[in-house]
């Protein structure tokens, strides 16, 4: 008998969904009907079309609002599988084993509240390694780094097993904050998270016309910023990411660390696509090849597919 399966890699900003063999990336956001507490108006990317009432139920890689996350998972699962309810759908969720137990339980509770028939939990690092076509059964160690919006995870694999894994509460949002701080300090301009994210995705441009609010008089203001200066500001935000990976390499056994000289480090996750990030890693770890997976954003979901 065939069963309906919906798989989800739940991130703070983006949820990668797998259903019917197809992988899709959706915003981790839900919009409620005006005046209704639990009536969903839209979920995922469609939720951002609503100017008000948009809720982001995941923070720091964990469920900040369990009920809203349950509604989001249920809505996306029904949309992607074509089912009317979640009662016949089996949920496969990627939940980091190194998350504190309380945060793991919150994610699992959201899945239960959504009414899925069953819940299967997978390690996102293992799924990401499979999705990125890493050779897990090689006798030489290979490292995978998953860079999310607000968290980072890292693991080294060899001989079909995990040699080491680590977790950090710093993610690509650290770069957003560095950009926001730069505008505040250099131009007395206040910008939001969404604008900082747009800037981060376009750091290869020569200049930017940025709209924000003046920190002096509170009125709208436009500032033209130099791209080179912004790239320098972004690199300050990347310091924590680089430090985490360097500490991960130092934590390996000497033989496993030496293997990385040939096998390298593979970056996955949405944060891996930041302009200049791979080059920063290469400068700090010049002897180790730094690779960005072609399917970096959906690697974990591809591994579960």
Which role does the model predict for each range below?
Residues 153:
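Positively charged, low-complexity, intrinsically disordered RNA-binding extensions
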Residues 1-144, 157-265, 272-294, 298-300, ...:
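Nucleotide/phosphate-binding catalytic cleft detector across ATP-hydrolyzing
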